């Protein structure tokens, strides 16, 4: 699966550390059972039942770690039922994108249980925006299926660890706890044992897994968490995460053993993103000669068909898409990469800063988003996106991350590949 760059999340986490003291941090606790997972456990114990588990998160969830390991645990613990995963993990993405894609990527497949993992990638985000996005995920989920149980899980990085070492949750997880408290959603802090080992000097945050006797001896009794301090090794750090979930399951099972219909009439924040929608870009007006890509036959578009509902390939300067929406927020879900060009953005007749669709990490193509406007006045807005002919010094762009142009022909084009519009509100025909 193609991933958004998870390094962006790491940078956001570092930026967010300075603001920890400005936000009240929740006490760190491995499990808060709250309303439990009653419907999930009842179905898991039913002979012949088909149980679907959704995993919505970032690159830590995308790894073959806690997601794969917990699914294996459920299969072993409840052999009378069958289990299938809905893998909705995209590296480098937070709840701000998750709230727009949860319907398409998870809810459309009818999950019985939804794990939500965004604490790391939301590390530098504003707490109130986290609350609005997480609440939007909850409300959309229960609107689609009131019997779907939800569990928040909080992962950790070296950069986000200082509060945990002092017995507090990081800022992003503390914000998420407000949503969990309000809706009675259980939460599991996956990094409690990680923090315990780190505080005792028995954790190597960033190192390769030892292979030789000399490497093992050099580590002593330290457990190697990750190669980069962020993405746990599947056989070490991810196992600690899985063990935290397994330890927490009994508490979640006894919290509530009655079938439950989840309701969400009252809102924690009236400005939550329950109205967030992922709209195929083909719903927009395309300029003359511009046509949607065939998501089944077009080699490039097909590679993104699991995440993007459509694609329009703007390859000539002057090609454009236009649309109107009624609401308060608009962004674009697209593919950036070596072939990325410059895009002119016009909102309500006013030119915005042009958006460059290649960055320092674009030695390969990946999913991305860019903002058109947010916190807009409730009402109708008009958007125009046009591909520009403006040249880009791509060598200089790549050099910012010590990358280089390998094959000039890969970087020569100046293209734009939008797939969806992210709207809080409604598209206006």
Positions of the model-derived regions?
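Oxyanion-hole/transition-state-stabilizing segment in secreted/luminal serine hydrolases
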Residues: 54, 66-68, 96-131
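The substrate-binding groove and active-site-proximal loops of carbohydrate-active enzymes
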Residues: 91, 119-129, 160-167, 231, ...
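A short helix->loop->beta-strand "cap" motif at the edges of active sites that frequently abuts
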Residues: 143-151
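Substrate-gating cap/lid alpha-helix
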Residues: 158-193, 197
């Amino acid at each position: 699966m193609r991933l958004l760059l998870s390094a962006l999340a790491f940078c956001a986490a570092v930026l967010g550390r300075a603001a920890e003291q400005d936000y009240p941090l929740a006490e760190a606790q491995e499990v808060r059972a709250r309303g439990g997972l009653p419907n999930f456990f009842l179905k898991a114990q039913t002979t012949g039942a088909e149980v679907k588990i959704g995993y919505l998160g970032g690159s830590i969830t995308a790894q073959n770690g806690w997601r794969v390991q917990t699914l294996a645990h459920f299969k072993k613990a409840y052999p009378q039922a069958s289990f299938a995963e809905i893998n909705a993990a995209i590296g480098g993405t937070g709840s701000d994108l998750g709230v727009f894609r949860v319907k398409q990527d998870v809810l459309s497949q009818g999950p019985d249980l939804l794990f939500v993992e965004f604490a790391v990638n939301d590390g530098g985000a504003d707490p109130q925006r986290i609350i609005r996005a997480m609440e939007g995920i909850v409300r959309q989920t229960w609107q689609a299926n009131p019997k779907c149980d939800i569990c928040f899980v909080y992962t950790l990085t070296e950069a986000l660890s200082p509060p945990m070492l002092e017995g507090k949750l990081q800022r992003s997880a503390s914000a998420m706890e407000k949503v969990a408290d309000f809706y009675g959603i259980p939460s599991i802090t996956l990094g409690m044992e990680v923090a315990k080992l780190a505080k005792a000097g028995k954790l190597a945050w960033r190192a390769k897994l030892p292979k030789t006797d000399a490497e093992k001896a050099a580590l002593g009794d330290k457990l190697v968490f990750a190669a980069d301090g962020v993405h746990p090794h599947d056989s070490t750090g991810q196992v600690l995460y899985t063990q935290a979930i397994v330890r927490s399951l009994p508490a979640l099972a006894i919290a509530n053993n009655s079938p439950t219909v989840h309701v969400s009439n009252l809102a924690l924040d009236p400005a939550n993103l329950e109205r967030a929608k992922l709209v195929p870009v083909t719903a927009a007006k395309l300029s003359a000669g511009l046509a949607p890509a065939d998501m089944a036959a077009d080699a490039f578009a097909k590679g993104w068909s699991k995440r993007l509902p459509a694609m329009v390939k703007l390859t000539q300067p002057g090609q454009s898409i236009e649309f109107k929406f009624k609401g308060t927020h608009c962004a674009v879900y697209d593919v950036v990469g070596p072939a990325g060009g410059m895009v002119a953005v016009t909102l309500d007749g006013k030119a915005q800063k042009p958006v460059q669709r290649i960055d320092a990490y674009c030695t390969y193509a990946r999913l991305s988003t860019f903002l058109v406007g947010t916190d807009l006045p409730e009402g109708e807005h008009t958007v125009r996106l046009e591909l520009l002919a403006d040249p880009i010094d791509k060598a200089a762009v790549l050099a910012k991350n010590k990358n280089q142009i390998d094959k000039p022909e890969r970087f020569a084009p100046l293209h734009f590949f939008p797939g969806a519009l992210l709207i809080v509100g409604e598209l206006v025909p």
